[in-house]
């Protein structure tokens, strides 16, 4: 265990030096925050942090501005005759009861749904207690950004390893050849890959080896790589199948240390037999010989790894692509070994990653229920988030009448968000747990504000499940809440849970529900909940964190290992503790009953005919892909002035040759049309994108009446999700295909009806 250096720190709420872990992304940068006269005076990287060692990005420096944002909601609000009124917490909970209880009494709990947003993954309180709301409220179907994000990876990991969050991550600190597909860590800082200063690590790889980026766009990551291979969107699975074909055809397969724990090699051989490099070269845009060369490079390099992320997930063959990345790593001997793809060993396990009852052992028993309108089947407890709007729009028995949103803005972040924007006012009840009056929450009847990140502790449970080192780092709050008697976010969720089950929100026994949740978590670890609960004089997320640390791989297990980790001992190390890099964990990390990696799950093999039918594309077709920016995080950091500086980022990027054929120039306003809808947006020409591909960022579309986002509304941008057809999906997982959307682009002056 490597502890950090300890220097004098100010107590919570006092002026002076504070340490805090940035909660915005997988980089989890350690911050040093200076507070003067009760305000954030400066933020810099904490050089003593055992994880990030002083690294930080622009988002981390914005925490003070976020905390002090005058638009941030600090007091509960209810809507009266169309106008917002600030009220007491008790009155806000009473209003929740007045709204939601009649809906449940009249229509049943099936008329209620919840949407939980991306910030939950980084929230100390919400991340641990969303499971209480979704698991105990009785709400039958809820929605999340998971099905416009990583759900294909959840699916492939469930089928291969028997755990829906059992993700192998690239050991980038020890690899010599890194192949990046559909990821841009220069902007994301890593995704489903937690590492400090990813781009710095990539520079180190280049000094001793090689970095290759395969992407339709020459991203900031690709610009700093040794090689950029532009690929046609949606063909990644075909490309990877050709890699697999070469490995098998040229006898390059080496299962390495996991040879005795891999099942399905012959099924994989049969599946790849029809996918030689020559078959996919034209479709992918990558020459057949380069495909074969890359297969040989991967097989011939001792420490190499392929890393695929959101560009592979958010496409119509996301499950196949996510699966095949792992297949290539396994077949080349770069699985469960240093420098390859390895399973992390987090110091604290996350409550999010608990097995789903009935789906243990990686069984493909999906479709346990389906949506009313489309008949979309459940996969791993989720249905496509794009189904939510049609379930509200379509009359009849089972129509959604009430919505609870938690830290989410689905009007901007989900397919057909413009339709959701139109139907939300028709709901009979809408309750939002949120910090801002945004494009979604403006439709709510009640807004229950959470705390600023700096007003609550932090420990990144979920993100540390993807970390290349076993690290734990607890951050105390920097400030006390403005109202010391206000409920914390976890208490809000428990009250809403009780309300859904028939108890008025204002009368819910928060402690009893919290103890019941804690008792269940203890049970999953083979502990007696009553005995363990008696050791605490408090509940809430700190109790949960202590238990997950103590029952983790380095914990004291409540006295069984006296020198083990506890929350109290972690608090004594304000710069964190680092237990070292990933270690081989097969078969222990597997959740399959036979301890085997299932290389060729039949559920995924059954999707190959669909790929075969779609792999050949119209060469004149334009397709849209998404992009992100270092100073943005989905839709929720656009109200920070420091992050909004510079030129307009919400543009359609197009290759100069494609623009010339259409008579377009940089700065022109164009109409972009898909089967999902149409938008107008300025165009920006570049050579750094594959011809036939256009790109837009997501998370924009501000400027709507009734929002309270002064800075964001000054640079509203356009909502690209209007172009996302709700039924354009990765069929095995139900994940939205937000990349590879066929579009037309015309000058707005020439567009019919413009």
Label for each model-derived stretch:
Residues 252-274, 505-523:
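Internal, active-site/partner-interface "lid" segment
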Residues 445:
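Catalytic, metal-anchored helix/loop core of enzyme active sites in primary metabolism
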Residues 243, 261-385:
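Active-site phosphate/pyrophosphate-binding segments
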Residues 223-231, 454, 458-461, 470-482:
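Short beta-alpha connecting loops at secondary-structure transitions
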Residues 107-111, 253-258, 305, 336-343, ...:
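Flexible, glycine/charged-enriched surface loops at secondary-structure junctions
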Residues 477-551, 635-653, 657-754:
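Long, contiguous, secondary-structure-rich segments that constitute the structural scaffold
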Residues 127-203, 207-214, 238-241, 327-442, ...:
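Extended redox/cofactor-interaction regions of prokaryotic respiratory oxidoreductases
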Residues 1-250, 287, 374, 378, ...:
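N-terminal export/assembly segments and adjacent metallocofactor-ligating motifs
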